[in-house]
């Protein structure tokens, strides 16, 4: 499989080829996804919820992100790795945005960065792109704005908000973003945006008309039971499989079944006899 990059994402849209993405936060999972042929891996600030146990993504820091981005880039050889910019790492100033985006590329070795917002982050996106760093936008339901939205709610259902989201998409393209994540918006609105902009749209809860799709892998595999978004399709119940394995392990250890001889190391009995005789 050829190495995925920004150009392959853009070419995919022009060739009507769907783009596949998933989130990953560690080496082993990134390696599995990479071997499966995934186009892109997002190291999302969603790690705050699914890995660190936060109630939202707002507490995630740059150090948290860099720690996980480094792990993922070690495991992904062919997938494009996109590093999320956490809350307040780019909103404060254009300078901070470029500096922190640079850390994700330079220290984390990611191939691109992602940040939330449209019109409001136009200058930040433009400056980051000018610094030769590829940017993936993110509009619609933006989790870092959860307090403004009053929760994780579908966005763009009325005319005014729908028009604002369309304008966000246009401005991100104008600023130089190479793609845009559309999250939690009606599929007809996502279709309009996908047809309006020339850069790829990656949907998560935005219907089938986007140029690509992304899911949080814990959601699709049944590994995160705190809540399950409506738009998530289950591709397996790994949570139940893992839970059963843990229970079986606990039972076998308590009952003396594991480890048996098959899982133990052996040595010559004569050596043991000598140790006993010598009082060791």
UniProtKB/Swiss-Prot annotation:
GO terms for molecular function: 3-methyl-2-oxobutanoate hydroxymethyltransferase activity; magnesium ion binding. Its EC number is 2.1.2.11. Mg(2+) binds at residues 45, 84, 116. It holds the Pfam family Pantoate_transf. Keywords: Cytoplasm, Magnesium, Metal-binding, Pantothenate biosynthesis, Transferase. Disulfide bonds: none annotated. It comes from the Bacteria. Its main location: cytoplasm. The keyword Transferase applies. The keyword tRNA processing does not apply. GO terms for cellular component: cytoplasm. Its cofactor is Mg(2+). Pathway: Cofactor biosynthesis; (R)-pantothenate biosynthesis; (R)-pantoate from 3-methyl-2-oxobutanoate: step 1/2. The active site is at residue 183. It is found in: Cytoplasm. GO terms for biological process: pantothenate biosynthetic process. Binds 1 Mg(2+) ion per subunit. Belongs to the PanB family. NCBIfam families: panB (TIGR00222), PRK00311.1 (NF001452). Homodecamer; pentamer of dimers. Catalyzes the reversible reaction in which hydroxymethyl group from 5,10-methylenetetrahydrofolate is transferred onto alpha-ketoisovalerate to form ketopantoate. This is 3-methyl-2-oxobutanoate hydroxymethyltransferase. The gene is panB.
């Amino acid at each position: 499989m050829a190495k995925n990059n920004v150009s392959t994402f853009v070419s995919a849209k022009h060739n009507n080829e769907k783009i596949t993405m998933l989130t990953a936060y560690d080496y082993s999972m990134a390696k599995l996804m990479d071997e499966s042929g995934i186009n892109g891996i997002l190291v999302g600030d969603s790690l705050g919820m699914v890995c660190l146990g936060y109630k939202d993504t707002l507490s995630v820091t740059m150090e948290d992100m860099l720690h996980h981005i480094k792990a993922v880039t070690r495991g992904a050889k062919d997938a494009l790795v996109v590093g999320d910019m956490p809350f307040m790492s780019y909103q404060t100033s254009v300078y901070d945005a470029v500096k922190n985006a640079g850390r994700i590329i330079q220290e984390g070795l990611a191939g691109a960065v992602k940040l939330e917002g449209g019109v409001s982050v136009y200058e930040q996106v433009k400056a980051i792109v000018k610094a030769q760093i590829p940017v993936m936008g993110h509009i619609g339901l933006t989790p870092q704005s959860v307090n403004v939205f009053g929760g994780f709610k579908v966005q763009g259902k009325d005319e005014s908000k729908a028009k604002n989201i369309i304008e966000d998409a246009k401005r991100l393209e104008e600023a130089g973003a190479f793609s845009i994540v559309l999250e939690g918006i009606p599929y007809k609105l996502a279709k309009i945006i996908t047809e309006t902009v020339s850069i790829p749209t990656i949907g998560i809860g935005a219907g089938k008309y986007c140029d690509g799709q992304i899911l949080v892998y814990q959601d699709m595999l049944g590994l995160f039971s705190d809540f399950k978004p409506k738009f998530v399709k289950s591709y397996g119940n790994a949570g139940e499989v893992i839970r059963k394995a843990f229970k079986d392990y606990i039972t076998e250890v308590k009952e003396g079944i594991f480890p048996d001889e098959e899982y133990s190391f052996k040595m010559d009995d004569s050596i043991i006899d000598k140790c006993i005789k010598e009082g060791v």
